[in-house]
Design a protein with these regions (language model features):
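N-terminal leader/linker segments that precede catalytic domains of diphosphate-processing enzymes
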Residues: 1-267
Length: 267
């Protein structure tokens, strides 16, 4: 296998200092059916200035303090904080990861996993509604904490029940910026278009996981180890229904925490 971090913008920690405490983060594998047999996954290319710059990754980011707000317990559909925390193996605050991954997905690629309170999946109905949600996305990217207010104003529930918990990775201690990341998987809504933000991400592709791994081996796509391993876990499925049924059937207590370790070689 090619070296995953080669060519990717990362910062190594001082080995003489205590390791950085990892920050909570959440990431989502957005998948869709192809016209022929198989599935595609959405990857974004991180901007050179960002952490993991140059690498193709899944949409996601840090869990913000606001993601733990009590008001989200009334906005999230199908998953309670107790259920989310139990799945993640933590005492409380688990729902914040589900909220964060929906928020980050909307911020980074413009896909909003939500339901209308009147019933049915959220998809913009016309150009006016599209423009309104582009404005919400821009405000979120500018740092405004408008997600809860947006859901209230637009009469939406966050579709937390459409996210399947997939994996748990912690950045190695050798790296300066570390994340305690929960990976989720969800089917992309048919009526929404995924578009990278042009700031933190500079390119995006829908690609079969098998093809993404092939292009990594050929040196055409830069990727980091968590991306590679999660891509491997979704290979070989005929459609998203089969894939999501398989991942939803996983007992969350069987999902191991993965924290790669690096060792210095003599010479």
């Amino acid at each position: 296998m090619k070296e995953p971090l080669k060519g990717v913008n990362t910062q190594m920690a001082d080995p003489n200092e205590a390791p950085t405490v990892p920050q909570p983060a959440a990431t989502v594998l957005l998948v869709r059916d192809t016209q022929e047999d198989g599935i595609e996954v959405f990857l974004i290319e991180r901007a050179a200035k960002t952490n993991f710059g140059g690498a193709y990754v899944f949409p996601g980011g840090k869990v913000d303090l606001e993601d733990s707000s009590d008001e989200f317990s009334e906005i999230c559909q199908g998953v309670s904080d107790e259920e989310a925390s139990s799945a993640l193996g933590i005492e409380k605050g688990g729902l914040a990861y589900w909220v964060a991954v929906i928020r980050e997905c909307f911020e980074e690629v413009g896909i909003l996993l939500a339901y209308r309170k009147e019933g049915g999946n959220f998809d913009p109905e016309d150009e006016s509604e599209k423009e309104r949600f582009v404005n919400y996305r821009n405000r979120l990217n500018d740092g405004e904490k408008v997600l809860a207010n947006m859901c209230e104003s637009e009469e939406l529930f966050l579709a937390t029940d459409r996210l399947a918990y997939l994996a748990h990775w912690i950045t190695p201690k050798i790296e300066k910026r570390r994340y305690d990341t929960r990976f989720f998987i969800a089917q992309a809504p048919e009526g929404q278009e995924a578009i990278h933000d042009g700031s933190e991400s500079v390119n995006s592709i829908w690609i079969k996981p098998e093809e993404a791994l092939k292009q990594f081996e050929e040196g055409k796509l830069l990727m980091i180890m968590p991306t590679i391993k999660n891509l491997e876990s979704i290979c070989g499925f005929s459609n998203t229904k089969e894939l999501l049924e398989s991942k939803n059937a996983i007992n969350p207590y069987d999902i191991a925490t993965i924290e790669p370790k690096f060792f210095m070689e003599n010479g």
